[in-house]
């Protein structure tokens, strides 16, 4: 079971949701990764909290450019992730 979300994580997830609903449809699908960078950001914030989740999200967004091949890039397992790998 994941820990409850901090207020900071909730705010950042809310901002990402605004981007997904209002800005992303205007830009069209162009993320080179699976999951998309915004979905990755939400999952990273949920798994790791505001500090590490934000850092992982920033690193991911900085990789999303035409010179990077993209592809499958899931969020790393979190401390409360009980799935076997």
Curated annotation (Swiss-Prot):
Name a single GO cellular component. Answer: plasma membrane
**Subcellular location field:** Cell inner membrane
Q: Which InterPro entries match?
A: Membr_insert_effic_factor_YidD (IPR002696)
- List the SMART domains: Haemolytic (SM01234)
UniProt keyword NADP, yes or no: no
Q: Specify whether Cell inner membrane is a keyword of the entry.
A: yes
Q: Which Cys pairs are S-S linked? A: none
Entry superkingdom: Bacteria
Q: How does it sit in the membrane?
A: Peripheral membrane protein
> What protein family does this chain belong to?
Belongs to the UPF0161 family.
State the protein's purpose. Could be involved in insertion of integral membrane proteins into the membrane.
UniProt protein name: Putative membrane protein insertion efficiency factor
Q: Which organism is it from?
A: Enterobacter sp. (strain 638)
What does UniProt list as this organism's lineage? Bacteria, Pseudomonadati, Pseudomonadota, Gammaproteobacteria, Enterobacterales
């Amino acid at each position: 079971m994941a820990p409850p979300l901090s207020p900071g994580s909730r705010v950042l997830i809310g901002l990402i949701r605004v981007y997904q609903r209002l800005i992303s449809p205007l830009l069209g699908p162009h993320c080179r990764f699976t999951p998309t960078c915004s979905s990755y950001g939400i999952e990273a914030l949920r798994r790791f909290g505001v500090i590490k989740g934000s850092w992982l999200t920033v690193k991911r967004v900085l990789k999303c450019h035409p010179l990077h091949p993209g592809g499958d890039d899931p969020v790393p397992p979190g401390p409360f992730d009980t799935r076997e790998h």
